[in-house]
A protein has these predicted regions:
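Bacterial N-terminal signal peptides
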Residues: 2-14
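Short, hydrophobic/aromatic-rich segments at coil-to-beta transitions
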Residues: 22-25, 55-57, 119-128
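Surface-exposed amphipathic alpha-helical segments
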Residues: 153-203
Length: 203
């Protein structure tokens, strides 16, 4: 199992040379560190939202909005939480999954893909799914990379909404692993004083 995870995640911090046409490199300051990944073609980044020690920035398919979307890729960060050195990224990923489960306890599914390292920072990948959630009772599945940073917890997530399903959704592991590959390389880097976009120190 451990060997399989190494193979599955060996390219998460690899070169961007094989990035698909139309994709773009995203590197953005988030709560004291730079977070980077490849944004697949067809998505458009929106303005960041910050509130105290929380950060969020979403990207939607062209023509979609925060109120009406079928797919969303997002970066989030949370600071001033208990970043205990003894607690792994898997611990925080489990907390995220538990929060999602409360939204759809009867139709919740989860598929852990396992631990990895992003620039020597502890990270964990998991897929969660709700068969029915929200006022319109749509189905929603999300793949979340949780990174335990120096003083904050970060996530990069790809979520998809589909028509409601009364049962627990069967998670298509192959589909989501392919999407994960579309987002490499993931990066987490220190902020360099005075450095401006495109943040060459984090390439």
């Amino acid at each position: 199992m451990a060997a399989a995870l190494v193979v599955a995640f060996s390219g998460l911090v690899g070169s961007a040379a094989l990035a698909a046409p139309g994709s773009s490199a995203i590197i953005t300051p988030v709560l004291g560190q730079l977070i980077g990944f490849t944004l697949p073609a067809g998505f458009e980044m929106q303005k960041e939202e910050t509130s105290g020690d929380r950060y969020f920035r979403g990207a939607f398919l062209k023509g979609e909005t925060t109120k009406n979307w079928t797919q969303m890729i997002s970066i989030s960060g949370a600071k001033n939480i208990d970043v205990d050195p003894a607690k792994s990224a898997q611990f925080f990923a489990a907390n995220i999954a538990n929060s999602i489960q409360k939204l759809c306890p009867d139709t919740f599914s989860v598929k852990p893909l396992g631990p990895t390292k992003i620039d020597n920072q502890d990270a964990f990948v998991a897929i969660t799914s709700c068969g029915k959630v929200g006022q319109d009772q749509h189905s929603e599945t999300g793949m979340t990379l949780t990174i335990k940073g120096a003083s904050a917890i970060y996530t990069v997530q790809w979520a998809e909404r589909t028509p409601a399903n009364a049962e627990n959704l069967t998670i298509d592991e192959g589909k989501w692993k392919d999407r994960l590959k579309q987002m490499v390389p993931f990066r987490i880097c220190p902020v360099v004083a005075g450095e401006k976009p495109p943040y060459p120190s984090c390439k």
